[in-house]
Amino acid sequence: MSLKNNFVTKFFLAIILIFLDIFSKQLVVRFVELNQFISINFFFDIVYIRNYGISFGLLADLYSAWIFILIGTLITVFIIFIYIQSMDKFEKLGLAFIIIGAISNIIDRIFNGFVIDFISFHYKEFYWPAFNFADIYIS
């Protein structure tokens, strides 16, 4: 595969993953009330949460969308630099997923002022903080 075709393929896959994240969030906004839990089974719920902070809602009290957008963008640019320098294909794959997830969550902050989280796992009364597909990509 030529270098150009390889880039186009990777770029297209990145766009699909970003679209999947954004589309899933918009489905939640359209069909789930804010803070509503929809039980799927004994350990999985769909919930509409607005995350004004960073991971797991941390620093939400210091909320400023533009600060998080700026910091997220700077970190993403730094990770892109590491990606470009890397020669290991598995490291590049992991970094690519982090970059894709970060870009998707930055898009959320730019257009909404917050990140939409909706995937909720729990065991009895212990709930893991809600997250989204972009968070899965980053993890």
Each model region followed by its residue ranges:
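Alpha-helical transmembrane bundles and membrane-interface segments of multipass inner-membrane proteins
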Residues: 1-139
